[in-house]
Amino acid sequence: MASIATSASTSLQARPRQLVIGAKQVKSFSYGSRSNLSFNLRQLPTRLTVYCAAKPETVDKVCAVVRKQLSLKEADEITAATKFAALGADSLDTVEIVMGLEEEFGIEMAEEKAQSIATVEQAAALIEELLLEKAK
């Protein structure tokens, strides 16, 4: 009997034998006898999905602060993956963004942590981490 180990959930069905892994990839095999084994692999197209650890509300507030600090128009798109540098922010602008975030959320960021922020998502995740610490 063939054995296949995967990290995704699997289900093995009776005749024709088919192994389904998740919803995006199907691997199947069939055999008439032990000596006649065939295996087919079909890769389905993948789509890029950006996942954000921070809450959407936090990301939205960070976007608003960034928009205000950099004097951006509403038409300028800012997402969780947006890098401050891509918006034209230099190191001084980043310091002003951090100060605006501290004021908006009522937190204080250590300089080492503040320097590691390069995207809206990183800022939002750090803010949520600091808010959790503050609540303790």
From Swiss-Prot:
Q: Which residues form the Carrier domain?
A: 56-131
Species name: Arabidopsis thaliana (Mouse-ear cress)
The keyword S-adenosyl-L-methionine is annotated on this UniProt entry: no
Q: What high-level taxonomic lineage is stated for the organism?
A: Eukaryota, Viridiplantae, Streptophyta, Embryophyta, Tracheophyta
Q: Which residues carry this modification: O-(pantetheine 4'-phosphoryl)serine?
A: S91
Where is it chiefly localized?
plastid
- Role according to the record: Carrier of the growing fatty acid chain in fatty acid biosynthesis.
The record, for HAMAP family, names: Acyl_carrier
Interval spanned by the transit peptide: 1-51
Q: Which domain of life is it from?
A: Eukaryota
Alphabetical UniProt keywords: Chloroplast, Fatty acid biosynthesis, Fatty acid metabolism, Lipid biosynthesis, Lipid metabolism, Phosphopantetheine, Phosphoprotein, Plastid, Transit peptide
Q: Which Gene3D superfamilies match?
A: ACP-like
Give yes or no: UniProt keyword Phosphoprotein: yes
Annotated Gene Ontology cellular component terms: chloroplast; chloroplast stroma
The record's similarity note reads:
Belongs to the acyl carrier protein (ACP) family.
Name of the featured protein: Acyl carrier protein 3, chloroplastic
Q: What induces it?
A: By sucrose in the dark. Down-regulated by starvation.
InterPro entries documented for this protein: ACP, ACP-like_sf, ACP_chloroplastic, PKS_PP-bd, PP-bd_ACP, Ppantetheine_attach_site
The record describes its post-translational modification as:
4'-phosphopantetheine is transferred from CoA to a specific serine of apo-ACP by acpS. This modification is essential for activity because fatty acids are bound in thioester linkage to the sulfhydryl of the prosthetic group.
Listed GO MF terms: acyl carrier activity; phosphopantetheine binding
